[in-house]
A protein has these predicted regions:
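Conserved N-terminal beta-strand and adjoining loop/helix that marks the start
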Residues: 1-15
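A short gly/proline-enriched turn/hairpin at secondary-structure junctions
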Residues: 29-30
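Unchanged
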Residues: 35-58, 68-123, 145-146
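Local beta-strand/beta-hairpin segments that build beta-sheet-rich folds
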Residues: 63-64
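Charged phosphate-binding loop/patch that engages nucleotide di/tri-phosphates or the phosphate backbone
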Residues: 120-146
Length: 146
């Protein structure tokens, strides 16, 4: 059973998302990815966020667990704080940068205004709806299954 860890990162009323063009299918998703066999979800979260954005997580709280049929069975969604930084950028050593270079898939980080988030073609609508509620009313104190 595969797992993924993803980050909700909000700064200055903007949410950090990854815009993907994967084999012609365009959508938005949260930063993050696969949990390796030798790590837990929090370790994967820290690693994936660093690889994909260059940002260092200083705090993370699990807020959602989502069943996701392909390619992961479960996604663990964390509300994250990050260390002070310059702008987020895909790191040259990441899988996303490699795929961008060989022009197989395109991955692009974007800071999206909270109010514009609902208009994005997000990968999973039920998670998008949960995030919208969290952005507007506050995220749950304990993890909720979506």
């Amino acid at each position: 059973m595969g797992k993924a860890a993803r980050a909700i990162i909000v700064e200055n009323d903007k949410l950090l998302v990854m815009h993907r063009n994967k084999q012609g299918s365009q959508y938005y998703t949260l930063v993050g990815g696969r949990v390796s066999d030798n790590e837990n979800t929090e370790q994967a979260l820290v690693r994936e966020v660093k690889e994909e954005t260059g940002l260092d997580i200083t705090e993370a709280r699990l807020v959602y667990v989502e069943f996701h049929p392909e390619p992961y069975n479960e996604q663990y969604i964390y509300l994250c704080e990050v260390a002070p930084h310059a702008d987020a950028a895909i790191q040259d050593t990441s899988e996303e940068a490699f795929l961008n270079r060989i022009n197989v898939n395109v991955h692009q980080l974007q800071w999206v205004e909270k109010k514009a988030f609902s208009k994005l073609a997000f990968r999973t609508p039920q998670l998008q709806e949960a995030i919208i509620i969290g952005l507007n009313k506050g995220f749950p104190k304990e993890a909720v299954r979506v």
